[in-house]
Amino acid sequence: MLIIPAIDLKDGHCVRLKQGVMENVTVFSEDPAAMARHWLDQGARRLHLVDLNGAFAGKPKNELAIRDIVDAIGDEIPTQLGGGIRDLETIERYLDDGITYIIIGTAAVKTPGFLHDACNAFPGHIMVGLDAKDGKVAVNGWSKVTGHDVVDLAKKFEDYGVEAIIYTDIGRDGMLSGVNLKATLELARALTIPVIASGGVSSLDDVKALCEMEPEGIAGAITGRAIYEGTLDFKVAQELADELSTQSSPRDTTILF
C-alpha cells in the first residue's frame, strides 16, 4: 500500500486546511516544488496535488506552481492532481505538462457525462475524488453537500472506467482524528477498482489498520497535516506499509505501483 504525501496549493503556497474551510489555513511552505523534492527524497512513490483555489473557482488557479512541481520531480514518480478540472482541454493540458492522473470531483457529480467523456478520451488517467460528509457527497470545494450517496455514485463511476476512487471524509480532514475506517471499508467492498483513503490519516495505527484492509481493495492512503506537523513520520509510515503489504494478498491494486 502506498502512503501518498499531499501538497495542497493555495495562492502558490503549500498549505493545509481544516475540514476544507479556506479560512482555516496553515501555510507549510512557500516553495511547493521544494516540498515535492523533499517527499521524493523521503521515499515517496506518488504525490497527491490539489489546486484549492481552483476547486472553489471551478477553473485552474495554481498552474505555475503545478508545473514547477512536475519540473522538480521529473518523471521519477507519478502525480495525481485535482481541483477545478471541469473540461477536457484542462485535462489534456495537465497531462501534456506531465501530470500522470487527473482527479475529477465536482464535475463528476454535477455533469457525469463529462466524466464519461474524460474516461473515453484519456483511458487509464482518470480518477474520481468523492468527498463526503456523513455519507453524502460534497461538491464545490466541499462547500455544498448533495443528497448523493457515496457508494452509489462510486459504483456508477466505476462502470464509466475510472482508475480509482479517492475517498475523503471531510469531517476528519486536517483534524488528525484518525481515518473513517468503517466508511472506507464499506466503499472498497462495494467496488472492484482500488480505493485510496484520505482524511484523518495521522498515525502508524491508521496506517496499520488500512494495511489490514488492503486485501479488500484499499490501495493507498493520502496524508497531509500529520506529516507536515510531525505526528506521522512519512518514511516510517511507508516502510511499515511495505512490510505489512508483503503479508497480505491484495485485490488488484497494481494501478499504484
UniProtKB/Swiss-Prot annotation:
It catalyses: 1-(5-phospho-beta-D-ribosyl)-5-[(5-phospho-beta-D-ribosylamino)methylideneamino]imidazole-4-carboxamide = 5-[(5-phospho-1-deoxy-D-ribulos-1-ylimino)methylamino]-1-(5-phospho-beta-D-ribosyl)imidazole-4-carboxamide. One of its GO terms (biological process) is L-tryptophan biosynthetic process. Pathway: Amino-acid biosynthesis; L-histidine biosynthesis; L-histidine from 5-phospho-alpha-D-ribose 1-diphosphate: step 4/9. InterPro entries: Aldolase_TIM, His_biosynth, HisA_bact_arch, Isoase_HisA-like, Isoase_HisA-like_bact, RibuloseP-bd_barrel. It is found in: Cytoplasm. Pfam families: His_biosynth. The keyword Zinc-finger does not apply. Its EC number is 5.3.1.16. It is an enzyme of class 5 (isomerase). The active site is at D8, D131. Keywords: Amino-acid biosynthesis, Cytoplasm, Histidine biosynthesis, Isomerase. It comes from the Bacteria. One of its GO terms (cellular component) is cytoplasm. GO terms for molecular function: 1-(5-phosphoribosyl)-5-[(5-phosphoribosylamino)methylideneamino]imidazole-4-carboxamide isomerase activity. NCBIfam families: 1-(5-phosphoribosyl)-5-[(5-phosphoribosylamino)methylideneamino]imidazole-4-carboxamide isomerase, PRK13585.1. PANTHER family: 1-(5-PHOSPHORIBOSYL)-5-[(5-PHOSPHORIBOSYLAMINO)METHYLIDENEAMINO] IMIDAZOLE-4-CARBOXAMIDE ISOMERASE. Belongs to the HisA/HisF family. This is 1-(5-phosphoribosyl)-5-[(5-phosphoribosylamino)methylideneamino] imidazole-4-carboxamide isomerase.
